[in-house]
């Protein structure tokens, strides 16, 4: 028999509240309750959550810190910020009689938390001391953003606190107003006008209340300590030691040798080694040593030379430096002992503390070995693979515009860290033309990584394509007979031509856009690929407008007092519609003539269509040879030409130029009232000479009428369509020449007995 399980747990009594009917209930305002809760949370900076007392929990009791600081109080007001900086300036000024107002460098320890605790007590502030410290630390790097201080207060703070001046406008203003001088870091080191500046205050001044700041100054490195470390390294290198590989044994010895120095003795050997590796070695080219000593140090430490210092070192020492910055060979010489730093005896003052900082592009010590050509090739293949979309088209990579650190996280073909690959790519992107890729592949790489193109690369690229460059020198488009490089889906509807530059070769330009010698431009481009050319209309249009051969045509066709009518923007087609449906639904105007046809399309106006298979630009006009035939006058009289007025044929909404030219004439057979029509000759047999002469006469007369109608068309267009562009008129003239040439070829085929493909 199954027993019933019972629990010994006693239920807790339920406390019930009974309201008295006679008691008046007050209405509670929820907004006041919420405001009260928020005020209570503001007052409590840290709250300890009480652990649960449930008997079912087996976890030990622990307290959890919950921060309740609100973000609304983190913003400093203008008065608070000015009060903070004026307090710092007063601390830097002398209060001793006879020296009141004189300013000295770094008299206060703004990095000490005790300093900001004292600042909070004196101003009776409500913020945390670290908030005052963070505010000062942030704006000391961009002090030009602090508004409300007088010019004298601002320049004194720049000098006393050694704040770097980061903007050129601020530097120019300080030079004009106070004749200040700067070091290579942008820190003010002296002035001819500010005579109240001192490097440090007199030792007799009372610094009571500021002893806590001196403790911070004792632990900071100065330029003297940097020089001591370099002397020690030179001695060890001369003995054959490796300061980087040996690490702690050498630097522990450095601490023992300088026990009397407070800064060095209070730090461990690991701290000195870390500072030497991160700060001193990358900034070796800034140190005041001779060039040969620096070259030996770069060689022994196996550290690459900064790019801006390579030329100087090569000129003075004759060292062989490879493309990565490493010294391959250095002529033998003796390493001299480094001389101590001597202060400059003038109105300038050297910074008391060391101004060396860790560079942003610091090379990892574990990755200092040279890259092999195979690794460089693997990096380029990875970049090319990542810059191709699903359709196989090269697109720009936004990550690679900067340093691209995250881009190489997926690079698995090497044991190096991705930070090292990133640093190597910064060097490789300047050596694209030295790779084994073809010109087209190099052009794709330049476009994908947004690398500015230099003059040598432009000379090579314009031999295969016409380039459109951005103001920064990067490639926006590259147009050739067989390819288009450039993402054109996000292009604006109207582009400013003066913002771009156009680089092209005249022969490649003619080959790309079609001439009489090359009648089928872009013939190898597929249909879906050619549709992308529609969106680059204005770039190609301005390309053609800059073409040198159009200058003569421009002078001949432009009307002096033509008033250009405002253009209406063409609505963008829907994504669901195909290119042909978008063409049918879009409005057609004379300035944006659209002719979307897979057989014989043409491009003109502001909307670029599929590239033509027939040329529209010809450097030389097509010249017809004079035709000889009998009884030409009688043939002309018998040929009935139906010629409609150009005004009726010119319908800007429905009729294109090609349709106008094809429909503006039609030939009829001679009158059959006097004699029956002659029988038709078979296709294979050549026509009789009399019939051939009659046919040639009709065709020649029809061509003449076509030219006459074309002139009437242009005259009508100039009178009624002032916005007809020069390039369009030139294209229409070229189209007329092509149609004339087609008639000539058809006549030759008739005379030879061949059939004509209509």
Curated annotation (Swiss-Prot):
Expressed in some neurons including the head and tail neurons, HSN and VC, in a subset of glial cells, in the distal tips cells and in the intestine. Residues 49-61 have a biased composition (Low complexity). SMART domains: SPK. Residues 30-48 have a biased composition (Acidic residues). Residues 30-70, 668-690 are annotated as: Disordered. Residues 676-689 have a biased composition (Pro residues). GO terms for biological process: small GTPase-mediated signal transduction. Keywords: Guanine-nucleotide releasing factor. A motif (GBA) lies at residues 653-666. It comes from the Eukaryota. Changing residue 660 to A: Abolishes binding to goa-1 and ability of gbas-1 to activate goa-1. Changing residue 661 to A: Abolishes binding to goa-1. One of its GO terms (molecular function) is guanyl-nucleotide exchange factor activity. Acts as a non-receptor guanine nucleotide exchange factor which binds to and activates G-protein alpha subunit goa-1. PANTHER family: G-PROTEIN ALPHA SUBUNIT ACTIVATING PROTEIN GBAS-1-RELATED (PTHR38627:SF1), GA BINDING AND ACTIVATING AND SPK (SPK) DOMAIN CONTAINING-RELATED (PTHR38627). The GBA (G-alpha binding and activating) motif mediates binding to the alpha subunits of guanine nucleotide-binding proteins (G proteins). Interacts (via GBA motif) with guanine nucleotide-binding protein G(o) subunit alpha goa-1 (in GDP-bound form); the interaction leads to activation of goa-1. This is G-protein alpha subunit activating protein gbas-1.
């Amino acid at each position: 028999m199954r027993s019933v399980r019972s629990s010994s747990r006693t239920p807790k009594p339920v406390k019930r509240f009974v309201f008295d009917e006679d008691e008046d209930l007050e209405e509670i305002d929820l907004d006041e309750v919420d405001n009260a809760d928020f005020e209570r949370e503001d007052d409590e900076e840290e709250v300890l959550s009480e652990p649960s007392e449930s008997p079912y929990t087996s976890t030990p009791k622990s307290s959890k810190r919950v921060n309740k600081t609100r973000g609304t109080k983190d913003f400093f007001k203008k008065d608070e910020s000015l009060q903070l900086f004026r307090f710092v300036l007063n601390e830097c000024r002398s209060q001793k009689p006879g020296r009141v107002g004189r300013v000295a460098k770094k008299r206060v320890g703004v990095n000490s938390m005790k300093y900001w605790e004292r600042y909070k007590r004196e101003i009776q502030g409500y913020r945390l001391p670290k908030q005052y410290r963070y505010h000062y630390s942030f704006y000391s790097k961009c002090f030009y953003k602090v508004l409300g201080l007088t010019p004298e207060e601002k320049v004194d703070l720049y000098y006393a606190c050694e704040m770097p001046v980061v903007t050129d406008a601020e530097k120019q203003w300080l030079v004009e107003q106070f004749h200040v001088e700067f070091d290579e870091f942008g820190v003010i080191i002296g002035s001819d006008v500010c005579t109240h500046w001192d490097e440090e205050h007199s030792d007799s001044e009372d610094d009571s209340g500021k002893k806590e700041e001196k403790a911070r100054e004792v632990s900071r490195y100065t330029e003297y300590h940097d020089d001591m470390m370099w002397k020690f390294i030179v001695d060890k290198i001369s003995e054959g030691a490796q300061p980087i590989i040996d690490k702690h044994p050498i630097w522990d010895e450095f601490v023992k040798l300088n026990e009397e120095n407070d800064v060095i003795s209070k730090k461990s050997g690991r701290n000195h080694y870390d500072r030497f590796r991160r700060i001193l070695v990358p900034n070796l080219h800034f140190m005041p040593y001779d060039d040969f000593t620096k070259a030996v140090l770069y060689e022994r430490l196996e550290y690459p030379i900064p790019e801006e210092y390579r030329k100087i070192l090569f000129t003075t020492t004759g060292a062989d430096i490879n493309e990565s910055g490493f010294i391959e060979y250095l002529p033998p010489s003796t390493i001299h002992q480094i001389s101590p730093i001597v202060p400059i005896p003038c109105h300038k003052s050297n910074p008391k503390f060391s101004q060396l900082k860790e560079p942003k592009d610091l090379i990892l010590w574990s990755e200092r070995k040279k890259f092999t050509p195979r690794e460089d090739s693997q990096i380029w293949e990875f970049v090319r693979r990542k810059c191709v979309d699903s359709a196989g088209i090269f697109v720009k990579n936004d990550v690679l515009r900067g340093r691209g650190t995250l881009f190489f996280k997926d690079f698995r073909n090497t044991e190096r860290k991705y930070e090292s690959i990133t640093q190597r790519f910064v060097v490789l992107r300047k050596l694209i033309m030295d790779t084994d890729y073809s010109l087209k592949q190099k052009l794709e790489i330049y476009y994908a990584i947004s690398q500015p193109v230099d003059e040598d690369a432009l000379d090579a690229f314009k031999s295969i394509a016409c380039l459109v460059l951005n103001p920064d020198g990067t490639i926006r488009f590259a147009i050739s007979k067989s390819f288009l490089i450039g993402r054109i889906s996000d292009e604006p509807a109207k582009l400013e031509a003066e913002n771009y530059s156009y680089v092209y070769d005249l022969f490649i330009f003619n080959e790309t856009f079609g001439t009489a010698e090359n009648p089928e431009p872009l013939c190898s481009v597929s249909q879906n690929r050619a549709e992308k050319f529609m969106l680059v209309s204005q770039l190609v249009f301005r390309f053609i407008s800059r073409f040198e051969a159009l200058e003569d045509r421009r002078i001949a066709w432009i009307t002096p007092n033509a008033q250009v009518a405002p253009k209406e923007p063409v609505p963008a087609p829907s994504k669901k519609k195909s290119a042909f449906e978008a063409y049918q639904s879009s409005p057609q105007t004379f300035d944006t003539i659209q002719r979307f046809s897979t057989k014989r399309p043409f491009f003109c106006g502001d909307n670029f269509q599929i590239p033509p298979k027939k040329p529209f630009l010809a450097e030389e006009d097509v010249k017809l040879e004079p035709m000889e035939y009998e009884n030409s006058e009688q043939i002309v009289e018998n040929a009935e030409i139906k010629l409609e007025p150009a005004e009726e044929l010119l319908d800007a909404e429905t009729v294109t130029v090609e349709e106008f030219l094809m429909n503006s004439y039609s030939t009829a057979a001679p009158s059959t009232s006097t004699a029956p029509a002659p029988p038709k000759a078979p296709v294979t047999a050549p026509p009789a000479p009399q019939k051939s002469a009659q046919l040639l006469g009709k065709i020649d007369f029809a061509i003449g009428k076509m030219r006459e109608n074309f002139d009437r068309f242009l005259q009508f267009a100039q009178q009624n369509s002032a916005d007809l562009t020069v390039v369009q008129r030139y294209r229409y003239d070229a189209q007329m020449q092509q149609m004339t040439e087609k008639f000539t070829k058809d006549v030759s085929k008739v005379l030879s007995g061949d059939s004509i493909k209509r």
